[in-house]
Amino acid sequence: MSLIIDKDGTISLYQGDSGELVVSGLDADKKYTVFFAIQDKDRNLIGEELQVSVTNSDTVTFILTPEYTDLLKVPKQKPYEIYFYGIKACEIDKHIENTMFIADTTYGDLNRIIVYPKKVKGT
């Protein structure tokens, strides 16, 4: 797995590689649907939002498949491309939605994904 998350929440990965993204800090006494989305620099959604429902747990894991990360293109003239991601936790019983802050971020901060071009085509 080549997905790396640094201390400020920036994700680095190779295009087309898989990885797991673990989100913690949920209230284990509540039911949630948690969403993960990636956008380009123009705020266009890349692929579909991923969603996971969880009950009685303070963590949820998103599986980033090779097909999903392959949507993150790196232009040939660039060594990498930057995308942005967001995570939202929605309480199922109360219809409350909260965008989650990653690491020490706050309003206006962007959660970055640095995507490097494929090294090997694979399957």
How would you label these PLM feature ranges?
Residues 1-123:
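Contiguous segments within soluble domain cores/interaction surfaces
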